[in-house]
């Protein structure tokens, strides 16, 4: 997948870049696997802002993705590779031998006409899903379950993956790009390969309007607000805030760990991810 850049004929196009979508084979989704979802624009049930900086995105249909891959030992043929506006990775429409259609996350390198399968006896091949305990060490996987039968939760975004690092009893050690090592039960499903669209992080938004299409509204700095609106607000002239960075509600930010220390899943984290000291 290549990156397309533009001549600076306008200020907006000077830094803008887009994917060339050369791998995409279908422009319209498969209608029986789409839904219309209500967009809340960051508002709660009372109509008040619950999450700031959201609203005004373009309309889109939700594609129903099969994250569980529990239709075992039935081969399926890849019919198309499609763009999904609801996620950064591409999706594939597959047709099982019994005639059922399904959407799955497209792994990098998959093509129309390829055959994929799920189940414990499946071949170690890109796009096949199986219990993570059946996958040999050193293999890259995506769409990894954390709870048996719940569906994939780890490595679902564009270009993401985890690597099988070893075994500890009935648990498999999964190493993530963040350097975190986590234990996953051997019966949890995972899909072979790296998630598609690995050039996604190279795309430059380029202009404010494109962010608005995605539903992202402008973010105002706290130091330019009044004291009633933000802890960093107020002061005569331009100030630096006068205190360590905090959120509008006073919680420390920029380096402050916000993960709850009593989460039950903490016992499955063997090695914590490294913190970037340069940020």
Curated annotation (Swiss-Prot):
Residues 270-279 have a biased composition (Basic residues). PROSITE patterns: RIBOSOMAL_L2. One of the primary rRNA binding proteins. Required for association of the 30S and 50S subunits to form the 70S ribosome, for tRNA binding and peptide bond formation. It has been suggested to have peptidyltransferase activity; this is somewhat controversial. Makes several contacts with the 16S rRNA in the 70S ribosome. The keyword RNA-binding applies. Residues 216-279 are annotated as: Disordered. Part of the 50S ribosomal subunit. Forms a bridge to the 30S subunit in the 70S ribosome. GO terms for molecular function: RNA binding; rRNA binding; structural constituent of ribosome; transferase activity. It comes from the Bacteria. Belongs to the universal ribosomal protein uL2 family. One of its GO terms (biological process) is cytoplasmic translation. This is Large ribosomal subunit protein uL2. NCBIfam families: rplB_bact. GO terms for cellular component: large ribosomal subunit. Gene3D superfamilies: 2.30.30.30, Nucleic acid-binding proteins, Ribosomal protein L2, domain 3.
């Amino acid at each position: 997948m290549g990156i397309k850049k533009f001549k600076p004929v306008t200020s907006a196009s000077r830094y803008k870049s887009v994917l060339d979508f050369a791998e995409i084979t279908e422009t319209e989704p498969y209608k029986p696997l789409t839904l219309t979802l209500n967009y809340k624009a960051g508002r709660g049930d009372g109509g008040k802002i619950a999450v700031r900086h959201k609203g005004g995105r373009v309309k889109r249909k939700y594609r129903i993705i099969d994250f569980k891959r529990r239709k075992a030992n039935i081969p399926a043929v890849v019919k198309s590779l499609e763009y999904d506006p609801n996620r950064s990775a591409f999706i594939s429409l597959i047709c099982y031998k019994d005639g059922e259609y399904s959407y799955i996350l497209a792994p990098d390198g998959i093509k129309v006409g390829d055959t994929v399968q799920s189940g414990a006896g499946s071949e170690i091949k890109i796009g096949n899903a199986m219990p993570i305990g059946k996958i040999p060490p050193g293999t890259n996987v995506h769409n990894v379950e954390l709870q048996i039968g719940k569906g994939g939760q780890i490595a679902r975004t564009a270009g993401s993956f985890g690597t099988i690092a070893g075994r500890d009893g009935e648990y498999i050690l999964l190493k993530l790009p963040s350097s975190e090592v986590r234990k996953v039960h051997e019966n949890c499903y995972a899909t072979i390969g790296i998630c598609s669209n690995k050039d996604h992080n190279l795309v430059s938004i380029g202009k404010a309007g494109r962010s608005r299409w995605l539903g992202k509204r402008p973010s105002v700095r706290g130091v330019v607000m009044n004291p009633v609106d933000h802890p960093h607000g107020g002061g005569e002239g331009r100030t630096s805030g006068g205190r360590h960075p905090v959120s509008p509600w006073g919680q420390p930010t920029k380096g402050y760990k916000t993960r709850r220390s009593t989460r039950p899943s903490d016992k499955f984290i063997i090695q914590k991810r490294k913190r970037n000291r340069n940020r």
